[in-house]
Amino acid sequence: MKINVWFIFFFGALGGLLFGFDTGIISGASPLIESNFKLTVAETGFVTSAVLIGSAAGALGVGPLADRFGRKKLLILASLFFIAGSLMTAFATGFGTMAIARIVLGLAVGSASALTPAYLAELAPAKHRGSLGSMFQLMITAGILLAYVSNLGFLGHDFMGIRDWRWMLGSALIPAVLLFIGGLLLPESPRFLFAKGDKENAERVLTHLRAKSGESVEAELAAMAEVDKQPKGGLKDLFTIARPAVIVAIGIMFLQQLVGINSVIYFLPQVFIKGFGFNEANAIWISVGIGVVNFVVTILATMIMDNFNRKTLLTFGSVVMTVALAILTVLNYTVSVETAAIPTMLLIATYIFGFAISWGPIAWLLIGEIFPMSVRGIGSSIGSAANWIGNFLVSQFFLVLLAVFHNNVGGPFGVFAVFAFISIFFVRYLVPETRGKSLEEIEMDLRK
């Protein structure tokens, strides 16, 4: 592929960087905001979770708009919400303004999480769609890691008399502006253009993206034309031909969260502070280490994604997570806290490996692949909203679970182990195999 084509996929996936950056940045900023604004525990919790409320709303709301106006215009709009939300959080004056700012930021994050998987899937050729579609999750992990580094860099440094946490939150402006500039340069999805009758521009974009023979573009256009002939029921398609896809999208996104990934991302420092008595600096460095593991393994996942069946990788990841979490649970109930600390750290890293090689990228990849063109925007939105609702549930109840189990991390991680075990059977019996198939082939399989 030409370098400018990689530029398209890089900027197309940049919403994931902002998604991950916001996820990671609040873990370092929230204790500082709590202290600065003298917030109650409940208010601090709401500041953290407000973005999840906005994200669920943004994910659900953007789908119908994307199917009507296109992916590109909505990505540009999401970048403007990112810019506005970043500025609002950096200049918040108290609980109320911070909560509103976080909801605005959530609208942007949720919109990007629904738009990007569908957009990348519609741009990528079938044989590279796994790797290119996985760039969204790679960007999420890169954003999380950059946020951890930003937290460490700004912590305790009140440049120009401005509090450190304001610099942390304001630093999101850099990728937000990049997304806006990139959005202006990105092409519209060729499949969206074709579906709207603009076959000339669809062919032009495809020819540029493929940079191959005209025959391969013609074959792809012919497949689009075949799908375009199929009867379309509008939103009714969600409850008829797309119903299996809706079940898979909701299930895979709920399970991606219920295996506990964001308990690690949001609360890992608190796990080691409350559960093992680590000081704050060491706990944050552990988070950085886990962030590096997450990022590096996701790079590996993008490299191998088109070499293995999606279901094979998902099952492998489920087994690794189940075993790591089960051992972690037993360990923390059978040995002393001092003895369990280092093995727990290693088992969490193993669990992250299992997630990052499979469920991290593939869940987002699938929601961009499995829906028919007529409802791909709204279908991707439903899957993304399910992810945010699951995220909200995990983030709200993790610390409660930790307290219920008397700060023994084996308790909540044991619950996550059960969901990881359930995910094995969900993949086996419900998830379709999409590797190597064109989006049109996947849609025709749904219609059979």
Predicted regions and their residues:
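TPR/TPR-like alpha-solenoid helical repeat scaffolds
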Residues: V217-D228
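Alpha-helical transmembrane bundle of multi-pass membrane proteins
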Residues: M1-N201, T207, D228-K448
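Short intracellular "coupling" helices and adjacent cytoplasmic loop segments at the cytosolic face
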Residues: H208-A219
